[in-house]
């Protein structure tokens, strides 16, 4: 967990260090959240002035605590999601940010989508490549997933790290070995050529 103050401090430090393309991610449709809550959040975001924002409609993951407590929260989640999405789109426009990518996930609040907004020239190519699954990604840390893309074979391979941070630290050698093995895998076509 982090606080609003920690976000503001981290953002300020990043700017002081010279970062000139900062994205902020927001989740809308949280339990008990209203469009007025989202409006207040967006006003704070506007004060900071990030170069891009990504607005995620809440997607309930199967392994999440919210999924386990769904019966308790289902009537309080995403009730006003269309108004929330409108608030974020309008504020992004006021900030001079334009939509540059959109993607959907399973189990999204209100059956909405995630939208990336960016200032001209500040679109995050990484986000586009990730969503289109066009780029190999080597991920580090607990709960992350490395994904290898083999475009010539229309094939993707994934290696997930353990989610628990303590387990990740205890098993770091295993995690590194799995990743190294995956990153040195030759495409299937290379193996077929060698056999011919």
Please report, for each region that a protein language model flagged, where it lies by residue:
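Short glycine-aromatic motifs
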Residues: 94-97
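Radical SAM enzyme core and accessory elements
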Residues: 116-196
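Conserved non-cysteine loop/helix-boundary elements of the Radical SAM core domain that shape
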Residues: 1-88
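Flexible glycine/acidic-rich beta-alpha junction loops that bind and position SAM and/or redox cofactors
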Residues: 28-35, 50-77, 99-124, 139-152
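Short alpha-helical functional segments enriched in proximate histidine and acidic residues
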Residues: 91
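Asparagine-centered polar/low-complexity signal
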Residues: 21-23, 114, 127
